[in-house]
């Protein structure tokens, strides 16, 4: 809630709107209340043999309504896109109290405005999201994860293309600087994962059957590869612990900034 001068702020919780519907196997969709957590939706999809494309480290506290209101990206944007790409229907209460409901999940629908696209990313300025209809995906299968030491951001970003073999599907690509790697490791008692220290470390995850065949041209680099689930979770922890690791230092100022890759490569 945003306080207005001379008025008491109002805080509205959607936590009790937490029902997750059954997966519609015919359309590959699921309906969920705004208060359901991202983890709830992902587990419901997985139990039915499907996969929800948005994932965050805060999956068990982030609500679906919140991820839609902010158009959350998460760690699999390169494979599945932002939250807006998953949204096929929405229900919301407008400022005047009217309820807008489009939860049928029809992909071929040109009847007027795309309210989902308008409300997604609006952060509550256009209405309060109460339920959503989401697109699901078939699981990518077994994957391989690699941490690769890099000397520049240009090299790190280049690996997102040159480091992936033809025919393999890139599932995730993350770039972490040396400070972030060190802090995450210190927080969880993990050693530096590579032979040498590097200013930048790139995390790549590819769908390749889980045998590392999806990587290309990284054998001569400083690299560690995880094939089993426990080793992959350990490598991912260096990325997923970033927020917690920096917060442990004291008051932090966090910004979610998007820049074109060529610009980032110049850093």
Predicted regions and their residues:
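Short secondary-structure boundary/hinge segments and terminal tails
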Residues: 1, 62-64, 181
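Glycine-rich N-terminal segment of FAD-binding domains in flavoprotein oxidoreductases
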Residues: 1-17, 32, 52-54
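A generic structural signal for beta-strand entry/edge sites
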Residues: 9, 27-31, 201
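Short, hinge-like loop/turn segments at secondary-structure boundaries
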Residues: 7-11, 71-72, 190-191
């Amino acid at each position: 809630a945003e306080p207005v001068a001379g008025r008491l702020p109002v805080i509205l919780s959607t936590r009790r709107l937490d029902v997750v519907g059954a997966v519609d196997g015919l359309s590959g969709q699921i309906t969920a209340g705004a208060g359901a957590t991202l983890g709830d939706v992902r587990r419901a999809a997985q139990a039915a043999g499907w996969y929800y494309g948005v994932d965050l480290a805060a999956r068990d506290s982030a609500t679906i309504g919140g991820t839609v209101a902010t158009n959350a990206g998460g760690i699999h944007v390169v494979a599945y896109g932002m939250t807006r790409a998953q949204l096929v229907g929405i229900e919301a209460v407008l400022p005047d109290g009217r309820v807008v409901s489009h939860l049928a999940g029809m992909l071929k629908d040109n009847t007027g405005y795309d309210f989902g696209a308008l409300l997604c990313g609006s952060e509550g300025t256009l209405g309060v999201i109460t339920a959503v209809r989401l697109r699901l995906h078939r699981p990518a299968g077994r994957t391989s994860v690699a941490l690769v030491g890099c000397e520049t951001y240009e090299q790190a970003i280049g690996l997102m293309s040159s480091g992936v073999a033809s025919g393999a599907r890139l599932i995730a690509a993350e770039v972490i600087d040396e400070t972030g790697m060190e802090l995450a490791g210190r927080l969880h008692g993990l050693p530096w994962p590579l032979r040498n220290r590097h200013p930048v470390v790139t995390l790549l995850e590819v769908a390749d059957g889980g045998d590392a065949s999806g990587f290309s041209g990284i054998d001569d680099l400083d690299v560690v590869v995880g094939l089993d689930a426990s080793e992959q979770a350990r490598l991912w922890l260096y990325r997923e612990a970033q927020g917690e690791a920096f917060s442990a230092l004291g008051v932090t100022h966090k910004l979610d900034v998007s820049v074109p890759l060529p610009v980032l490569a110049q850093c």
